[in-house]
């Protein structure tokens, strides 16, 4: 946690680290690096001897798994297996890299991600039976909290095989509180399946994960799930993909029936119908002619599909204009080309719970999503020269390079570090370089994960997603590489907490255990922070929402046997400025012996929302010697965590060092650091300081008879109603923006107003200015606490 627990300054030089070519390199500063609360001690500094002081003492590869395209009447045999792609010969592959697919499954909560994954594992032979989320038996939801609540909390990885292809799958959460799990999964994946509920269509968290996939340039296919549900509408969902996501859907399947009459799909690529009879848990299906009443519709959609894809091949375009349709293989090749280039997203449909449509989805993963070889070479920077770009091809013959994207505590193995191998080979017992820290680490064991179970492997090759045991200093987002060929890959941005609560153990005997638990949980989850507030003598935990912190407290109890008292939730406010100010500050101290002298002029400028903090030097002619500028940077950086109004972090500010002077004897880095602190206090006060609060996008789905009550309640919470919509069943959708401070315990109020018939989703939309009267209350409260 050390690197994630400390504040970091991004200078123009540091901003130019190149990452994957899929993601455009940007020189804008990440606001997330400067939005932590009070300075948090490094978790690595909390040794067992210092814990009490910190917390205070007052309180198989199966070849028979085949594509549906091979025969007309299919029954895909399943068998449990334990043979994986890693052969005994370390230097050889059993699956070529071109046949690798590293994919994630992402969607809004309850769209059916884990249910779909369970069917994939069953039909590919990875599991011998189907696990169900509602029964708490889903393989990928292995945590007790996941099984009890029926939701995915942590991303889980597994490996399976289909049609002689190796598919590494990461199943991700859908709840907004656990969006970090989606972020770090997408950072290391090559493709994704985006699921949509055919009744609800594109939901708020669907939009969030779609933007995350856009951010990392991840090619994806869409699967409109739950076609068997009352109110299912494939075509409305297709339209919402256009209007809500701004994407270009390419329909390659049509549903045959819907709701209780959903029987199968029309495959527009083959121009055939695929029908499931319900036998053998969906393993049996028939490939038949398209029903007569759907032939005209199928012809129209097939023509639209072909018109869109022939644009990617001149010869195919010429033939099509001459009346010659491309054959099936050419159609697949062109769909694959357009998918990988993100020109469109193929759209399919089915019902995972009813075991319909999953095998064609697996074929689409193989046919349309990229292998590591289909993507540009991974780019990184030279640790010794951050402006120098280094490339790593996806090849076993390249020097090893991998990215740590997840830390997990295993009760039997200890700490596990999940790594995506981009290039080269890695063997158990070998040494790797942590390029971010410049430290060598020894690999204890290499483990291939299947949810929370594991299998030892001898070697990891390019394209693999592997768990490493034995690493002590590596954290999420850091690069592991060949010690003789160092490279730093682009890190991930971690969302900053928006909510905090005070926590303390119920007994003094649990102080050390709670400290140990919090450290381990923070190592696993970079969006979870904790700190000791000495002013109020409390430990404060911070997270992405009430559910997030509720799970943290529950894990403390279950995994670390710590009973804790938890305070009321509090909002993580920010501070910023509204105008430019420039201040000259002289730090002078003479008390015998060498004195202290530093003279600086700093200009503070407001930046666009979400810009974070930026430092810039405009010193010319050596007015402030180069060796003293880091002192100014450090002094300003330290102050950014503690604003002048109520002690909240300062964001969206650029500090420009414009002038200054020094003394040959009395000046030092420390003197300029102290001068920077003084300049910060004076400059920010003159720059129109203001407080910002998190504003949440709140979507409420309610029966029409309760619409007035819902709107009135949102208005009373300082809410801004943006729009209304309709959903099947006489339901109304209210889209609004509401301050997070007004949303605590909203679920109880909503249930009471609507007799339990309404539901809502909430996610962070932006930070906005706090009304003056509330700002005054917060400032007064902070002053009372400080006193």
UniProtKB/Swiss-Prot annotation:
Location of the transit peptide in the chain: 1-86
Record region (Disordered): 14-34
Record key words, sorted: Chloroplast, Elongation factor, GTP-binding, Nucleotide-binding, Plastid, Protein biosynthesis, Transit peptide
Compositionally biased spans, kind Polar residues: 14-24
Lineage: superkingdom: Eukaryota
Binding site for GTP: 107-114, 171-175, 225-228
Function of the protein: Chloroplast-localized elongation factor EF-G involved in protein synthesis in plastids. Catalyzes the GTP-dependent ribosomal translocation step during translation elongation. During this step, the ribosome changes from the pre-translocational (PRE) to the post-translocational (POST) state as the newly formed A-site-bound peptidyl-tRNA and P-site-bound deacylated tRNA move to the P and E sites, respectively. Catalyzes the coordinated movement of the two tRNA molecules, the mRNA and conformational changes in the ribosome.
NCBIfam families named among the record's database cross-references: EF-G, PRK12740.1-3, PRK12740.1-5, small_GTP
Listed name of the protein: Elongation factor G-1, chloroplastic
Native species: Glycine max
Lineage, broadest ranks: Eukaryota, Viridiplantae, Streptophyta, Embryophyta, Tracheophyta
Recorded name of the encoding gene: fusA1
